[in-house]
Amino acid sequence: MVKITSGNKKKYGTIDVFNLSEWGRPIARITAQFLEKKPISVIQVTNIHFLLSLFCAWLILEGYLLESCFLLVIKGVIDAVDGELARIRERPSHVGRYWDTVADTIGLIAVMCAFGVVLDWEIALTSIIILATLLQYSLFNHFSILMRTLGSGDSTSRIDERIRPIAQPWESQTTVNIFHTIYVLFYSWQDSLVSKLSGKGSEKLRFELTVSSSLGYGMQSIIIFLLALTQNLIYLPHLVLGVNGFLVALVLLRSRVG
């Protein structure tokens, strides 16, 4: 067992998990180690993957579907760098956690709207796909946070974010308050809904985390890239609403039967 120190602190603490969406974390960890002493902040890394998402949405609208889907995979790796960098530097950030969620959501909406335009989706279908994807991400995040709690890993994220957190010494409480308010207004309903639908879960939550991790961005971006590579992006709604919907039901059922 690897000793958890400032240099090698793991996301899930002492628990070894099989997370399908975190295939890129070793790359992210190496990148974070390279950036540890560099004059770049965690927020700046988040800004990079946020801008990359918007760039991918523009590429989709311009017809560069394969290129944009490939960059969306790269975006997922960069998305993991900010968290790894915060862990290595031992400077967790509430602002960073909230901004990362907001940035991911804006990027998701931009990309899915771009797909909707190119693939000629109805506005209602685009809206449903965005909503379903957000809930699927929330389900994965729910069990990811529970697993971190079990393993005494990263404790920055919480199942219930309605209670305003105390700013870290290196953060501004005013800024934390602003981002916390934004998070509660737009995202707390997702957390509450997932918490109500899911049960206590199995003893070690490995089944729930592994299956729900296939709904996470890392795995979904790979699948979408494969759809683009095989020129089958027309089946994207079937993926989000069909296959992923079945996996959501499977995870929720397993979490209730224990």
What is the meaning of each model-derived region?
Residues 42-95, 111-112, 128-131:
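Membrane-embedded alpha-helical segments that form the functional core of polytopic membrane enzymes
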Residues 30, 80, 84, 138-150:
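Membrane-spanning helices that line or support transport/gating and their immediate boundary helices
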Residues 60-67, 117-124, 229-238:
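Transmembrane helix interruption/hinge and helix-loop junction motifs
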Residues 53-61, 111-115, 141, 228, ...:
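Structural signal for membrane-spanning alpha-helices in multi-pass inner-membrane proteins
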Residues 88-94, 119-121, 149-153:
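Juxtamembrane helix-boundary/capping and inter-helix hinge elements in multi-pass membrane proteins
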Residues 1-26, 146-258:
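C-terminal membrane-associated helical module and adjoining short loops/tails
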Residues 116-147:
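Alpha-helical transmembrane segments
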Residues 42-46, 99-104, 209-218:
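Select subsegments of transmembrane alpha-helices in polytopic membrane proteins
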